[in-house]
């Protein structure tokens, strides 16, 4: 097994669109959501996901969606990301029920929650990501005639820089409680950038605010993923994406950071916990995947 070269395809000022580098991973996850939507008994249906794949023209993902698998192995990653999607959906639903009317989706990518969820009246959903990614999403959804179910505000910004000023300039109210999601981002940040991200979120979060985070206790090791595909032939993880080269070594624990900076952190769960909570019995392949990814699903409040 070769030593993974974490972050070897990254630089401090790298940029991307939806079909390159880190941007492609958002497209890949949209593909998994689309596959989950057509699987038996899906936890959530994101019917916009397949639209993004079609618009991208990506041959790998369009091919997979044209012939979706049905075995436990083939549905492994769609199943795991179905659970993750449901986790964040439930988080925002609960925040809205508690009276929070500002939602901030960090690294929004191809997230369609502004269009899918039933938001309370007067809710604003801020989507923060690179301009090229937001432009692709807006174009595709606009061509579909999709209408958001809340006031949707795009904030074009690099999350490694000071994105708090553009967010406030877009109308974010620092005096009102907010609900934050950080989904699928942390592996692509250095430890320093992760600290800066949470520091900015904390500085913008009024009392009553909430946060939900999806994190990994290990980085996505390309060799481990390849070995998984060999031991479970139906698993097709990545379309040959080298996640090791796009991600960084794990250092800080997000739950520990939040607890040390004024947040009350709920018990941390993993993907298997989420599945059990949704009445599912995780098959062997799911247990194996979470064994090396060491997923963390974190919620906290101020």
Swiss-Prot record:
Residue pairs linked by disulfide bridges in the UniProt entry: none
Pfam families, sorted: LCM
An example molecular function term from Gene Ontology annotations: methyltransferase activity
Enzyme class, first EC level, given as a word: transferase
Binding site for S-adenosyl-L-methionine: 129, 158-159
Biological-process GO terms, alphabetical: methylation
Keyword terms of this UniProt record: Methyltransferase, S-adenosyl-L-methionine, Transferase
EC number(s) stated in the UniProt entry for this protein: 2.1.1.-
Tree of life domain: Bacteria
Entry-linked InterPro entries: Ppm1/Ppm2/Tcmp, SAM-dependent_MTases_sf, SAM_mthyl_Trfase_ML2640-like
Chain's role: Exhibits S-adenosyl-L-methionine-dependent methyltransferase activity.
Family: Belongs to the UPF0677 family.
Protein name per UniProt: Putative S-adenosyl-L-methionine-dependent methyltransferase MAP_1622c
Biological source species: Mycolicibacterium paratuberculosis (strain ATCC BAA-968 / K-10)
